[in-house]
Amino acid sequence: MASTKLFFSVITVMMLIAMASEMVNGSAFTVWSGPGCNNRAERYSKCGCSAIHQKGGYDFSYTGQTAALYNQAGCSGVAHTRFGSSARACNPFGWKSIFIQC
């Protein structure tokens, strides 16, 4: 009985560690004020919708979570662009919000 409880406790801890490490290594969207991929940078990696403040260039680092970019605030309307892999462009863009699917 004690060995069964220990076994399930160990399995539970291992699952929690795996889930926590997945959250730490989530996809991330970095934007710069510009020109290009220079000057002030902001990074977005939380699940759900985030407002984009810098628009000089971007880098999306894909690690399993896809993202949708919107031309409207609040991730409203139809997604203009979707990322399912890493992408980078050091040119100005007009997206106003990003939704990272977790």
Swiss-Prot record:
It comes from the Eukaryota. It is found in: Secreted. Residues 1-26 form the signal peptide. The keyword Disulfide bond applies. GO terms for biological process: defense response to bacterium; defense response to fungus; killing of cells of another organism; negative regulation of growth. Antimicrobial peptide which inhibits the growth of a variety of fungi, oomycetes, Gram-positive bacterial phytopatogenes and S.cerevisiae in vitro. No activity against E.coli. This is Antimicrobial peptide 1. The lineage of its organism: Eukaryota, Viridiplantae, Streptophyta, Embryophyta, Tracheophyta.
